[in-house]
């Protein structure tokens, strides 16, 4: 018995594939982590079928490779995501994501009185994980927020 399978999102020859992003989070990751700040082709799949979770998002960035630090920052919002390095249409490296200790110059502090809104400083958060809950503590105002609150703080 043979079956024909068709990729729903075109394969890339060289670059990074971020797979198993929770549905509805892909666009936010593109924006937060400035993944579109490139002139390389980016392919996005939204609400794709997933055996693991029902639905998922997918991002493919040609000729661009995420560092381990960049990939780990994604873990906060896509903890089960996989980040694959592709060379000549083959996966040559899989990055295992883990929460970073800090996230700098990516997120916005939800505290409207925080100096990071009015001063020329990059945001900086300490990442804390306790009992499966992730929170972020702002370096400047020292307030602690649930990671989803910070995700929606734009």
Curated annotation (Swiss-Prot):
Q: Which cysteines are joined by disulfide bonds?
A: none
Q: Which cofactor does it need?
A: Zn(2+)
For this protein, what does the record note about how its cofactor is bound? Binds 1 zinc ion per subunit.
The keyword Oxidoreductase belongs to this UniProt entry's keyword annotation: no
Q: What Gene Ontology molecular-function terms does this entry list? A: metal ion binding
Q: Which keywords appear in this protein's UniProt record, sorted alphabetically?
A: Metal-binding, Pyrimidine biosynthesis, Zinc
Of the GO CC terms on this record, one is: aspartate carbamoyltransferase complex
Q: What does this protein do?
A: Involved in allosteric regulation of aspartate carbamoyltransferase.
Q: How does it assemble?
A: Contains catalytic and regulatory chains.
State what protein this is by name: Aspartate carbamoyltransferase regulatory chain
Organism, by scientific name, is: Yersinia pestis
Per the UniProt record, the lineage of the source organism begins with: Bacteria, Pseudomonadati, Pseudomonadota, Gammaproteobacteria, Enterobacterales
Q: Which gene encodes it?
A: pyrI
């Amino acid at each position: 018995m043979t079956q024909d399978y068709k990729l729903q999102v075109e394969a890339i020859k060289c670059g990074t594939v971020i797979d198993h992003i929770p549905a509805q989070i892909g666009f936010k990751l593109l924006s937060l982590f400035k993944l579109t700040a490139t002139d390389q082709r980016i392919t996005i799949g939204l609400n794709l079928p997933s055996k693991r979770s029902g639905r998922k998002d997918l991002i493919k960035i040609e000729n661009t490779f995420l560092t381990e630090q960049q990939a780990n920052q994604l873990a906060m919002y896509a903890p089960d995501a996989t980040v694959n390095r592709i060379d000549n249409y083959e996966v040559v490296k899989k990055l295992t994501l883990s929460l970073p200790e800090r996230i700098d110059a990516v997120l916005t502090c939800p505290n409207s009185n925080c100096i990071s809104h009015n001063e020329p400083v990059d945001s900086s958060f300490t990442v804390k994980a306790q009992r499966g809950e992730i929170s972020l503590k702002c370096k400047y105002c020292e307030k602690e927020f649930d990671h989803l609150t910070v995700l929606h703080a734009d």
